[in-house]
Amino acid sequence: ISLAGITMLSCLSPTLVCAEQPHGFIDYRHEYLDDTRTHADRVEFGTFFSNGIGLMGELRYNTDEGDKDKWDPSQFGNNGTGLSVVYRFKPLDDKKFWLEPMFWLDTTQYWSTYEYGLSAGYDFSKEWKVSGRFRYDMDKATDKSKGYGNDDRNNRRYDVWIDYRPQKTNFQYQLNLVYYNNGYLTWNDGHKNYTASFKVGYKIGSWIPYMSIADYKGVDKTSSNRQIRWRWGLTYTF
């Protein structure tokens, strides 16, 4: 489900935006996992107001469960939806520092998840920006999920973003580090996990095509195996 931008999505993180003028975005993203060899798609959209409030939605689709090397949008299954509200403000005289509480409601056929989080960031310059987020997720198992032996669970997630947008170029770079402490078996026979991803985008007017590569957990939750996660997409800002 998610988490990682500073101004008009120029730093490639649609869920982190400035409250300076009304604006919005639409983002399409495709994902491929090289070990499971499965595809997934996501469309995210949002609008943000000058008072700091932002509203976002997300639609996710994936290939039929168990199918590998298959990418046929007409055969994609619903992989969940999400709705979010955020509020960005600058509490200090130093206007380079900002805070952003958030709430996200995510639903799939197996879980209804209530996500509460707080982001903080500092804009060192036009080129360098750093932000972080703590998120607490409350997973409520659906009847279908309980049929597989699952129960309600709580999870913690910690994100760090480092954004670099060099002057006199349209390229944009982002490093995202994620640490998970989940209430269920996740990776390496334990409840903890991590993801490290690097993202490159190129701004062309209101469009930002991008690509990312990540060190991602493997299929077997009891081993330390990892796999590569590829993502590429296109963001339109307005």
Feature locations, PLM:
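Repeated loop/turn-to-beta-strand initiation elements of outer-membrane beta-barrel proteins
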Residues: 21-24, 51-57, 90-100, 126-132, ...
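Detector for outer-membrane/organellar transmembrane beta-barrel domains
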Residues: 94-97, 113-185, 194
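Residues that define the transmembrane beta-barrel architecture of outer-membrane proteins
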Residues: 37-41, 45, 76-83, 112-116, ...
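Outer-membrane beta-barrel architecture
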Residues: 44-46, 84-88, 117-121, 159-163, ...
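Sequence/structural signature of outer-membrane beta-barrel proteins
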Residues: 31-35, 60-72, 90-92, 102-111, ...
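Outer-membrane beta-barrel "beta-signal"
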Residues: 166, 202, 225-238
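Cleavable N-terminal export/targeting peptides
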Residues: 1-25, 238
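Short glycine/proline- and aromatic-enriched beta-strand/turn motifs that initiate or cap beta-hairpins
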Residues: 16-68
